[in-house]
Amino acid sequence: MANNKKRGGIVVFVVILLIAAGIGAYTIATDSSRYDGSAGFFNNFIVRKDYIASLYIEGVIETENKTYNHEWLIDTIRSLEDDEKNKAILLTVDSPGGGVYESDEVYLALRDYTEHTGRPIYAYMTTLAASGGYYISCAAETIYANRNTLTGSIGVIASQSVDMTELLKKLGVKVETITAGKNKNMLNINSPLTDEQRAIMQSIADEAYEQFTAIVAKSRGMKIGEVKKLADGRIYTASQAKKNGLVDEIGTWEDALSSLRKELDDDESVVTTYRYEKKDSLLEMLSEAVSKAGKTDALIPDAIRSELMLGISYPAYIYRK
């Protein structure tokens, strides 16, 4: 009898694992598919009428998070480019920015869309379209901002390091990292930055800054010197941004759509929404629940935890509150 109960418990455990694996596989499949918040999956096969793509770019621009998936976004832009039923893209941007690489790749994909199809791109900024969010918006021929939008933040964070050598020493913790190359360990929490290493990271920031300002100058029809006067990393209100030539109009999403329709001379095309939203697998939900229940971070002081979470180890066009 005991053996039967044991075997029964094993069977139940295996079934739970199989269900979790199945849900995980389903989640992966849906995450990598084109997701339309109003019409379901594989939207390009469903829509038969001419349409304007309402494409949302939300959250931190990186490989993947709850609201942003880089691979999905690039694939979606390229699919729209290949679809003759698509007549234009209306971007809705609500992002503090993100990685230099990801921001530039999205910008280039949008520019390719316009150059290869001749179709227009408009951008509408909501709460925040800063740094990389503004960088991507520069791919649009016309930029609308909500009257409460914060934008700009034209600048670069090359990296952020936290020097914890003194703290580790007080705690009696000794960290050893074996490397080859004198600068291989830079940005490590147990290795203070040298002047040479600061210069290395500054050169990376400067190069990314030159790229950013050149993109803005080209997009906005401004001289590079004019852009650099504005590009000190600060954010701008919508009215300030318009006054300085960083956006074209202040209005609503409907205003932007109306203007785009007027340019297209088209009141009949439907508007189809493309918006990424990650769905956690059962395993991810269980892992999060276990983590919260275990309170594994309880021993880390809040000030230190916040610094570690905000750490940036790659060049980023991002607005920091």
Model-derived segments and their meaning:
Residues I136-T142:
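Alpha-helix C-terminal capping segments
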Residues E102-S103, G133-I136, V156:
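Short, conserved acidic/polar surface loops in the N-terminal third of protein domains
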